[in-house]
Design a protein with these regions (language model features):
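Anionic-ligand anchoring segments at beta-strand to alpha-helix junctions in alpha/beta enzyme folds, i.e.
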Residues: 1-22, 261
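Short, basic, glycine/proline-bearing loop/turn elements
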Residues: 2, 26-33
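Short, well-ordered beta-strand core segments
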Residues: 26, 55, 72-74
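Glycine/threonine-rich flexible loop motifs
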Residues: 32-43
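A short helix->loop->beta-strand "cap" motif at the edges of active sites that frequently abuts
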Residues: 47-54
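Short, polar loop motifs at secondary-structure junctions
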Residues: 58-64
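Long, well-ordered, tryptophan-enriched scaffold segments
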Residues: 66-67, 71-217
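A glycine-rich, hydrophobic/aromatic-adjacent loop/helix-cap motif
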Residues: 175, 181, 197-276
Length: 276
């Protein structure tokens, strides 16, 4: 199942869960937690809805969860990836909003990608990014907390006569084909509805907001998704859940209050840590 693969790769956990205590906008796809979840889960959902969390349910049928949500959006079965790809297109190329500090500091978005689709590397095998101040490709130094501020998130550059783009630029360019109009022909969800959900996703994410918990300040990104068997049990679930995590990544809603967390069943750490 795609969820378990991404749970391990992104969260070090077997499953992924929304932080219902602080989440203000929840997208539920392929799951019916209000009747198929456990007692504790139902209690958390009830409390979240009672305090004002907005819940949008994308499901082919009007489930009990859809009936309790703020909006039910019927979708053609197995087309959730098209819906989320269109949301990404709207956010990146129509609205033009994202959490730049998170993307620069926590993801490979500034890494340079060559014509062959692989990250560019120097003679020592280190991944390269573009330094905006020196205007040249430099090795990524994860030990330097100041470096991300200097790196280009978007752009096309030349390194040793090789044309390259940042990883985030390639994502932004790639999703241009996934317009809401295209997604409407696939999912049967109106293009305007997709745009409205994408706009809400950005607005509720509160990019730049923080929250203090137990004397420590954390980023606050109160938007999340909840996926279920209706997503993971169909063809291409890996790509669907990749699109889901990209949605969270764009706004920095990963492992922060209000956002997308690893579940209570922990794995053995990040998979790269297991490689000798």
């Amino acid at each position: 199942q795609g969820e378990h693969m991404f749970g391990n790769m992104w969260h070090g956990a077997f499953t992924c869960e929304p932080d219902l205590k602080y989440c203000n906008y929840l997208l539920v796809l392929g799951r019916n937690p209000m009747s198929s979840g456990g007692v504790a889960e139902n209690y958390q959902y009830a409390n979240a809805l009672a305090r004002g969390m907005k819940m949008i349910v994308v499901d082919p049928r009007l489930s009990p969860t859809g009936a309790k949500g703020n909006q039910w959006i019927p979708i053609k079965p197995g087309t959730d990836s098209a819906f989320m790809l269109a949301m990404i297109q709207v956010i990146l190329n129509e609205i033009g909003a994202w959490d730049e500090p998170f993307l620069l500091e926590k993801t490979n978005s500034p890494y340079l990608v060559g014509p062959d689709g692989y990250f560019l590397r120097d003679e020592d095998g280190k991944v390269l990014a573009w330094d905006k101040l020196s205007k040249q490709a430099v090795p990524v130094d994860n030990s330097n907390p100041e470096q991300p501020k200097r790196l280009a998130l978007l752009g096309e550059f030349t390194y040793k006569k090789t044309s390259c783009k940042t990883s985030f630029q390639m994502l932004k360019d790639h999703v241009k084909q996934y317009t809401p109009e295209w997604a409407e022909s696939v999912t049967e969800i109106k293009a305007n509805t997709i745009r409205e959900v994408a706009k809400d996703w950005i607005e509720y994410a509160q990019i730049g907001a923080t929250i203090e918990l137990d004397g420590q300040v954390f980023p606050l990104r109160p938007v999340a998704t909840k996926l279920g068997r209706g997503i993971t049990g169909v063809m291409r679930s890996y790509q669907t859940i990749l699109a889901n995590h990209i949605l969270a990544m764009i706004v920095g809603s990963i492992e922060v209050p209000g956002g997308h967390w690893g579940g209570i069943i922990e794995s053995r750490g990040h998979f790269r840590g297991l490689i000798p």
